[in-house]
Amino acid sequence: MGLSSTTWFVIAVIIVLLGVGLLFVDRKQQGGSAAVKDRRRWAALRGWEFLDTDPVLPSRWRYGTIHQGGPGVAKNLISGEVPLPDGSRQAYVFDHEQAGRVTSVLAAIQSQTQLNAAVELRLPTAPVPDDVALEYLEPVGERYAFVSDADAVRPLLTRRLARAADAVGDDVELLWAEESWVLATAPVESSADRLQELLADLAEVAIALEQGQNAHT
């Protein structure tokens, strides 16, 4: 007994859906591969180091998305120095994999001073931190400051910091500073050019924090 026309129609629909699904996966993989090649090329042009994976680096920090989803693993990591007028700063950019999936691109740049407390600067669209060690302090430009020590951080929240934080852009909902690092999370699809701009913006945030700290020491 042959299959009915309805059955053949259902089979055809399933085949089409499977084909579309495979095409989507293939394009997604190609896009990911292109992004990795782009980052490799970027690292090579600047003499930076590229690593496929680093399971240890993210555990260096504890606030921001590190607290939210755990240290996870650094994928497609590039590391090197960002030249600035007052000296070069160590920097990292990597795909942040948490619980088996990449949740964001994390960029980090080293500061020349050590902060006595942590500060997270979140856009209004970002979720409120669930870290009990942080408390809301005040607005900083377009962002809200959540800090681990209000007395230590308040003098650092200058107009220059507000301008630097606002310049980071609306695609970066969360940036934070802890110890001698300034970090930010960017969307997974961020281009190499955008990440280069982000590192420059984070350098300005780091300088603003340094100046605020030096003015009160």
Name each model-derived stretch:
Residues 1-13:
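Feature marks short, highly hydrophobic, charge-poor N-terminal signal-anchor/signal peptide-like helices
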Residues 12-20:
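Core hydrophobic alpha-helical transmembrane segments of single-pass membrane proteins
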Residues 15-16, 30, 55-65:
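Membrane-cytosol interface segments
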Residues 20-45:
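Transmembrane-cytosolic junction motif
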Residues 40, 44-46, 52, 58, ...:
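Charged, low-complexity intrinsically disordered regions
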